[in-house]
């Protein structure tokens, strides 16, 4: 089915509707799973030596010093234009503003007289950021990960990226307070961060996108007792646009293509109650495709994408909630009125002047988002991902005495005698003191 095929949702059977919202299949092949497992074990056993061997094998690069020197970072900074540096500074300021506002106030309540309960927040002590290499370095992801890590107060923030690391990535790391940068890419970088080597420190949690090998490596280390936690499950990028008859077709098309150009497994969907809007968007997509350097990639993504005509905007919202897109763009009159009806989306963009690109780079929200349907249970990345919450309770003698019989009754009902005894012994001690 080509992207210019306009689909009438209400003419489809329930099974056809289900198929329309199916995402392109993703699963690690057995060979990838085995290869990644071998890489993890090898890096854990042989450390830096294994990292250098993998760099030669996969990156075709001889790495002498795994850690990037301060001189190299300074030289990278010199090579960048002032215009780009200023743009990064604006983006970081907005990201800082939004993520600082996410700080939770401490919770300190007396649940009943003499029973004090608190919730306090602490940073994750050490985090590792993975940034892919390639022809289009994702330096914006450095800003999105390192900025909240700094605000959270993480004591150690390190970054791995395949050599040679782009100047933009090195400068962004310095700008956002990353302490150490390492010339390591792929599954071997995830292994190094999870287990530690002579050069790369072991971290508590790993963040960042990557290819199938990186994704599988993150999955595997997150399930190993000696591994590390990860940010969230990863999947292909996606966008869903809800547009009414008043939307601008060129704007809608550009937003759809901005996701389609990410990769051939990306998925884009247009929902509109106006059949004429669907037709005009399809035409605009074709016009804009002709001008894109990554047109072939975008065209492959469009093969799994959809133009769907609905009964009304309420049905658009219903379908969107069922799909749960990574990015949801609402280009309708009074777009904000629909927000309260949205239940599942990674990030929402309202109105003609809120392109998804704004959130990707500089509005201040985070561009690391749940995808592949994980919006049903996962949140967009934020300050909380770099923190952990801890509860504290303190009972006075009076508070304990008032609550003791309740605890004893509940513990006895669960047949946990030692739990009950821990209370009964204290009750008896208080009686002896009286």
From Swiss-Prot:
A single BP term in Gene Ontology: L-histidine biosynthetic process
Source superkingdom: Bacteria
Any one GO molecular function term: histidinol dehydrogenase activity
InterPro entries, per database record: Ald_DH/histidinol_DH, Histidinol_DH_CS, Histidinol_DH_monofunct, Hstdl_DH
Pathway: Amino-acid biosynthesis; L-histidine biosynthesis; L-histidine from 5-phospho-alpha-D-ribose 1-diphosphate: step 9/9
Chain positions recorded as NAD(+) binding sites: 130, 188, 211
One Pfam family recorded for the sequence: Histidinol_dh
Keywords: Amino-acid biosynthesis, Histidine biosynthesis, Metal-binding, NAD, Oxidoreductase, Zinc
CC annotations in GO: cytoplasm; cytosol
Cofactor requirements of the protein: Zn(2+)
Keyword Cell wall biogenesis/degradation: no
Active-site residues (renumbered): 326-327
Enzyme Commission designation: 1.1.1.23
Segments traversing the membrane: none
Free-text remark on how the cofactor is bound: Binds 1 zinc ion per subunit.
Ligand binding (Zn(2+)): 259, 262, 360, 419
Catalytic activity field: L-histidinol + 2 NAD(+) + H2O = L-histidine + 2 NADH + 3 H(+)
Amino-acid biosynthesis recorded as keyword: yes
Record Gene3D superfamilies: 1.20.5.1300, Nitrogenase molybdenum iron protein domain
Annotated family: Belongs to the histidinol dehydrogenase family.
Function: Catalyzes the sequential NAD-dependent oxidations of L-histidinol to L-histidinaldehyde and then to L-histidine.
Subunit annotation: Homodimer.
Protein name as catalogued: Histidinol dehydrogenase
